[in-house]
Amino acid sequence: MARVKTGKTAHKRHKKVLKLAKGFRGARSKLFRPANQFVMKSLKYAYIGRKLRKRDFRKLWITRINAATRANGLSYSKFMNGLKLAGIDMNRKVLSEMAIYDKEGFAQLVETAKQKLNA
């Protein structure tokens, strides 16, 4: 059986890793081993970051809604409960956008939630 040389394959793999390491500092972008280690670590960070981004945005939306509802005399949790009782099904992203760009419409939603809470 003939011996298989992996020169082309290894070269291709090294080029792929070094391309991913573009922009890293020092040996991490020039030499294969440190570049490979840091590329693997950076891919882990990217994976974790994609999960954290969802949490961060939800936190941001809730903070914005809370600030806007408190300006209208209601807490976030009571506001969300009032919307649920009123049968209004809007996600937090849309509510936070309304709180910023459509203050009158958001105030109407808060009033609707207040009425349903008092009823």
From Swiss-Prot:
GO BP term, pick one: ribosomal large subunit assembly
UniProt xrefs under Pfam families: Ribosomal_L20
SUPFAM superfamilies the record matches: Ribosomal protein L20
GO cellular component: ribonucleoprotein complex; ribosome
PROSITE patterns, alphabetized: RIBOSOMAL_L20
GO MF, any single term: structural constituent of ribosome
Keywords: Ribonucleoprotein, Ribosomal protein, RNA-binding, rRNA-binding
Source organism, top-level taxon: Bacteria
Intrachain disulfide bonds: none
CDD domains (UniProt xref): Ribosomal_L20 (cd07026)
HAMAP family xrefs: Ribosomal_bL20
Function: Binds directly to 23S ribosomal RNA and is necessary for the in vitro assembly process of the 50S ribosomal subunit. It is not involved in the protein synthesizing functions of that subunit.
NCBIfam families: rplT_bact (TIGR01032)
Family the UniProt entry places it in: Belongs to the bacterial ribosomal protein bL20 family.
The name this protein goes by in its record: Large ribosomal subunit protein bL20
Species the sequence originates in: Alkaliphilus oremlandii (strain OhILAs)
